[in-house]
Amino acid sequence: MNHDAILAAKAVNYTNAGTVEFIVDPKGTYYFMEMNTRIQVEHGVTEMVTGTDLIIEQIRIAMGEPLSFSQHDVTPKGHAIECRINAEIPEKNFMPSPGVVKHLHLPAGNGVRVDTALYTGYRIPSEYDSMIAKVIVHAPDRNCLLYTSPSPRDRQKS
């Protein structure tokens, strides 16, 4: 897939950050779905497994500078998973849940990354993107990753 993603970008002379998406069937055969010519919400997963800051690289390209690495330098290591934290009420058809963050305890530790602007006292408005945080966890292998991933829902406070 990596090789085909690179070929797709080269075929259209694409030189910025982007995501090539594939779908994989139960037999492991993959099919091209689309290419998004932007940084996506899930970019943190890629950053965790490659050690590359994609936002910095995108800024470098916009400034006319070359990437600070070559494709040959990119070697994925381990596995990562992203959990999105949304201010919604699942039992009410995922209705928005505005309000004030009274207590905030974010997961932390080796291989844990939290992307958020939340803080104690933050007022979540009623007109907002419901995703208020992302918890990304990286581990050497998938089993270790799933075993050590924090459970944000268990830690949530209102």
Show where each model-derived region lies.
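ATP-dependent carboxylate activation and anion-phosphoryl transfer catalytic cores
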Residues: 1-149, 153
